[in-house]
Amino acid sequence: MAEAALEAVRRALQEFPAAARDLNVPRVVPYLDEPPSPLCFYRDWVCPNRPCIIRNALQHWPALQKWSLSYLRATVGSTEVSVAVTPDGYADAVRGDRFVMPAERRLPISHVLDVLEGRAQHPGVLYVQKQCSNLPTELPQLLSDIESHVPWASESLGKMPDAVNFWLGDASAVTSLHKDHYENLYCVVSGEKHFLLHPPSDRPFIPYNLYTPATYQLTEEGTFRVVDEEAMEKVPWIPLDPLAPDLTQYPSYSQAQALHCTVRAGEMLYLPALWFHHVQQSHGCIAVNFWYDMEYDLKYSYFQLMDTLTRATGLD
C-alpha cells in the first residue's frame, strides 16, 4: 500500500512538467518590442511566471552608447573591485564532491581590462560578478549612466530592487545551473549573454545533491587549490552540466525541456523567480541586472512542496 502510494506520487511528479508546458510554459522566450506598462508586466509575465525579452528598454541609458572597454578604463580604471578568480571559469559550481566558490581578489578594473584585451596575464579566469549590489557600492561613478531601478517594474512589483549588479568577464566565465528567489531584470549593455532556462516545473527532472562547501585559493605559484570551508553547512546544488548532461547518471534530465535564448546589447531579459538558468557570454560582455525580491506567495509554497516531494520520492 505504501509503495503503491509512493509510486503514484512519483508518477504525478513525472507527468506534471508536461502538463505545465501545455498550459503555461512557453516553447520559446517571446520578445516585446517595448517595455510593458506596470499592469501588463504584472498580469502577463510576473503573475504567470513567464520570461520575456524586452527590446527598447535601455535606449535612454547613456551607458548603451558610452560603455565600452575603453570607456571603463578611462572612467573607473583605477577603481578596485571584487573579482572572482577560478581555474576554469566556473564560480559557485560542483567540482567532484565539493561545491567550490571562487577565489576573490581586489583588482583595479584596468587590470581586468588588460587581461580581457590580452595586454596582461593573470592565472585563471577573471569575472567581475560580485552579487551584492556591487554597482552602487564599488562603481558608483557609473551610476549616472543607467537608472537606479526599472521604474515600470518597481511600480508593478511595489518595491525597489534589493540589488543592482555589474557583470564583466570573458567568454570562459560560466554561471552554473541554479535558481534564485528574485524577479531578475537582466540588461545587456555590450556584447551578448546566452541563457539556458528551465521552468520551475522541471524540478522533478533536475538533480540536486548536498556538497561540502570549499573555496579556490590562488597560490603564489599561480596554481589553484581547493580548501574546505569547515564552518559552513553543506550546500544543495545541481551537479549536472546542461550543455553536456551525463544521462547515464541522471537519466531523468532527458525529459526536461530547456529554453535557449540570447540577450543582445540593448535588450532586457525578464527572468522570473525560481526559473533555473545557466549563463554564458561573449568576450568582454558588460551587463547590469536588477534583483527584486519575489513574493513568497502560493507559487513559492507550491514549488517548495514539489521540491520536497521530489527529494522524498528519490526522483533526484
From Swiss-Prot:
One of its GO terms (molecular function) is endopeptidase activity. Pfam families: Cupin_8 (PF13621). Bifunctional enzyme that acts both as an endopeptidase and 2-oxoglutarate-dependent monooxygenase. Endopeptidase that cleaves histones N-terminal tails at the carboxyl side of methylated arginine or lysine residues, to generate 'tailless nucleosomes', which may trigger transcription elongation. Preferentially recognizes and cleaves monomethylated and dimethylated arginine residues of histones H2, H3 and H4. After initial cleavage, continues to digest histones tails via its aminopeptidase activity. Additionally, may play a role in protein biosynthesis by modifying the translation machinery. Transmembrane segments: none annotated. The gene is Jmjd7. Fe cation binds at residues 178, 180, 277. It is found in: Nucleus; Cytoplasm. Its main location: nucleus. Residues 128-307 form the JmjC domain. Coiled coil: none annotated. This is Bifunctional peptidase and (3S)-lysyl hydroxylase Jmjd7. InterPro entries: Cupin_8 (IPR041667), JmjC_dom (IPR003347), RmlC-like_jellyroll (IPR014710). Keywords: Aminopeptidase, Cytoplasm, Disulfide bond, Hydrolase, Iron, Metal-binding, Monooxygenase, Nucleus, Oxidoreductase, Protease. Its cofactor is Fe(2+). Homodimer; disulfide-linked. Interacts with DRG1 and DRG2. Its EC number is 1.14.11.63, 3.4.-.-. GO terms for cellular component: cytoplasm; nucleus. It catalyses: L-lysyl-[protein] + 2-oxoglutarate + O2 = (3S)-3-hydroxy-L-lysyl-[protein] + succinate + CO2. GO terms for biological process: proteolysis.
